[in-house]
């Protein structure tokens, strides 16, 4: 009992102290015109900005950008390739800008390219007739397989070779990304109804949390086909911002 009485005495002294010193101070601050803001200190907006920046940085560290098929045989008309994507050349600047933003944010950049045997034996059956004479599209070591002018693989980036439409088909891409803890994908390149679309559908099937296609950093042979493919991908939960919307 004596200990309980001592505790009660201490609490009583504390309450009286608050009444004598703190309450008059708060009353004075309130009456001075500051209201609640005068009593409760403002948290600097920089604090919230810092928290948002930290959250964004954490998200970017779990994000990969896939740059798909931005090779000369697909996007450079001067090559005369039978697989030229008519809208490909126009999006080269947007792809370059998207890659620059990704690198600045610390996003892992993967360059997905086709490189085929000169014989064409590793290409889809319906395209093998293009490889007579060992000079088919994107043959390994030939100029057509190079990245478009203005696009470069830099230290820290990753190059992935595929021989089919999807970047995930018969490659180790999913293994690499999951090992690195990647959860989100941002996709740019060509072309929308084929390699972009199949890669996206495989990514969704593989349970990547967020899959995003930058609509003006991707292209197809025709604008209507591009837009139709974008609409289809939106129906399965794929995000489709423009480059400007994504970079904000």
Can you say where each PLM-predicted feature lies in the sequence?
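Early exported N-terminus immediately downstream of N-terminal targeting peptides
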Residues: 109, 113-132
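A short alpha/beta connector and helix-capping loop motif
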Residues: 61, 79-102, 106-114
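Active-site-adjacent betaalpha module
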Residues: 2-64, 97-105, 128-248
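Short acidic, Gly/Ser-rich segments with clustered Asp/Glu that frequently serve as metal-coordination loops
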Residues: 71-77
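Active-site loop signature of alpha/beta-hydrolase-fold enzymes
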Residues: 73, 117, 220
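N-terminal nucleotide-binding beta1-loop-alpha1 segment
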Residues: 64-70
């Amino acid at each position: 009992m004596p200990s309980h009485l001592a505790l009660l005495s201490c609490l009583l002294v504390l309450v009286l102290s608050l009444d004598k010193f703190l309450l008059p101070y708060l009353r004075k601050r309130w009456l001075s015109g500051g209201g609640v803001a005068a009593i409760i200190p403002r948290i600097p907006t920089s604090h919230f900005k810092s928290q948002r920046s930290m959250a964004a940085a954490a998200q970017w560290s779990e994000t990969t950008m896939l740059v798909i098929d931005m090779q000369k045989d697909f996007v450079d008309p001067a090559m005369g390739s039978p697989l030229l994507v008519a809208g490909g050349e126009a999006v080269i600047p947007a792809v370059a800008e998207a890659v620059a933003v990704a690198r600045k944010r610390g996003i892992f950049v993967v360059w997905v390219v086709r490189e085929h045997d000169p014989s064409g034996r590793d290409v889809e059956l319906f395209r093998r007739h293009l490889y007579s004479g060992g000079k088919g599209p994107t043959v390994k070591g030939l100029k057509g397989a190079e990245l478009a002018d203005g696009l470069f693989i830099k230290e820290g980036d990753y190059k992935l070779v595929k021989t089919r439409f999807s970047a995930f088909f018969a490659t180790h891409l999913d293994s690499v990304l999951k090992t690195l803890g990647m959860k989100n994908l941002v996709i740019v390149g060509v072309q929308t109804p084929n390699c972009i679309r199949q890669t996206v559908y495989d990514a969704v099937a593989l349970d990547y949390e967020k899959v995003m296609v930058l609509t003006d950093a991707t292209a197809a042979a025709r604008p209507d086909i591009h837009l139709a493919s974008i609409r289809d991908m939106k129906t399965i939960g794929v995000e489709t911002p423009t480059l400007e919307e994504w970079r904000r």
